[in-house]
């Protein structure tokens, strides 16, 4: 099935001289890696094509040096828009993709809705970068160090350094395929995970803010007035804080709440149970064990927390952990 979809995608790519690559707002390593990786892949294999990348400026991973292109609206009328790492239309940065001649999506979230003319969605992949890597391998496309490094970055970040459940034998096969190119792993991991001492102190302070529900759901709530003043947007802060609760012994569900100007950003996580239906109920989505949503206020956030607590209680009572993804 994937082989056929990859062939269809390659045919679409060959058909259009201009290709514009989109991804989700507030990009993480997988969004940026898939965007930069696909951009390099297309430029390496189709040097006569115009390839552009669009979206909000990335602040979380400056070492990736992924600049965004500013292009006029009229570029879309005869272009193929490629959408990466987006489980729904609300996630897509820059809605001009709707005016493109044709659209193509590569994604690894749980399927929620049709987004593109050709949707390639497989939630068994650990990352959108892994899906692009397999596309490159199956279609026998030329791979450069730039493309390989970007795609590897997304694979390692979205798999939690190859720890999360979505990591599979295929993950390592594709990582090995990418490592056929000279990736500087020491430099990559340093840029991804080394922190200034001041940031480590902040992490320690934030850990002191962790609270627990009756059934041991860990959570942090950050009010808008308590947001850091370094310019990071609330979704970026929220994603960073949720990871602090990942390795607490005896905690199987955790959530971070971060207020912004008009909503509360919620990052839901579990290492055992399917929390996705709760995120979907509140208008979000993602994966079985890693999902997100936004709610209008603190009261709604606390209601969501109650539902996570009830899930943890029911799951503990039945003692039947969920399976992968």
Question: Positions of the model-derived regions?
Answer:
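An acidic intrinsically disordered interaction segment
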Residues: 1-7, 90-92, 96-103, 123-132
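Membrane-interfacial amphipathic helices and adjacent loop/beta segments
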Residues: 58-69, 132
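Active-site cofactor/cluster-binding pocket
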Residues: 65-118
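Hydrophobic helix-and-loop "lid/oligomerization" segment in the mid-to-C-terminal part
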Residues: 2-25, 29-62, 73-78, 157-325
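Structural signal for conserved beta-strand scaffold positions within catalytic alpha/beta enzyme cores
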Residues: 53, 83, 105, 120-122, ...
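Glycine-rich, phosphate-binding/catalytic loops in enzymes
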Residues: 37-39, 98-101, 121-122, 173
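Conserved beta-strand segments of alpha/beta enzyme cores
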Residues: 50-52, 102, 119, 142
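Short alpha-helices
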Residues: 109-174
């Amino acid at each position: 099935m994937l082989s056929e979809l990859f062939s269809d995608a390659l045919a679409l790519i060959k058909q259009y001289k201009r290709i514009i690559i989109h991804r989700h707002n507030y990009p993480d390593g997988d969004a940026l890696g898939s965007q930069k990786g696909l951009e390099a892949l297309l430029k390496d294999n189709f040097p006569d094509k115009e390839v552009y990348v669009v979206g909000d400026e990335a602040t979380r991973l400056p070492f990736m040096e992924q600049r965004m292109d500013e292009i006029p609206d009229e570029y879309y009328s005869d272009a193929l828009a490629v959408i990466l790492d987006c489980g729904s239309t609300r996630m897509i940065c820059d809605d001009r993709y709707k005016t493109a001649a044709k659209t193509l999506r590569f994604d690894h979230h749980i399927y929620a809705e049709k987004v593109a003319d050709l949707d390639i969605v497989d939630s068994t992949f650990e990352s959108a970068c892994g899906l692009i890597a397999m596309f490159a391998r199956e279609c026998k496309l030329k791979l450069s160090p730039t493309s390989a490094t970007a795609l590897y970055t997304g694979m390692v970040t979205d798999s939690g350094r190859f720890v999360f459940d979505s990591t599979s034998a295929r993950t390592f096969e594709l990582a090995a395929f990418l490592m056929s190119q000279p990736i500087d792993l020491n430099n990559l991991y340093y840029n991804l995970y080394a922190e200034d001492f001041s940031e480590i102190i902040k992490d320690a302070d934030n850990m002191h803010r962790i609270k627990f529900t009756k059934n041991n759901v860990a959570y942090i709530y950050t009010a808008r007035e308590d947001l850091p003043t370094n310019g990071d947007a609330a979704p970026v802060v929220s994603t960073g804080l949720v990871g602090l609760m990942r390795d607490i012994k005896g905690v199987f569900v955790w959530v971070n709440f971060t207020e912004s100007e008009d909503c509360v950003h919620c990052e839901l996580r579990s290492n055992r149970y399917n929390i996705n239906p709760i995120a979907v109920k509140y208008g979000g989505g993602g994966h079985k064990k890693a999902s997100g949503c936004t709610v209008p206020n603190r009261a709604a956030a606390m209601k969501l927390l109650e539902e996570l607590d009830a899930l943890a209680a029911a799951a503990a009572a039945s003692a039947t952990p969920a399976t992968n993804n």
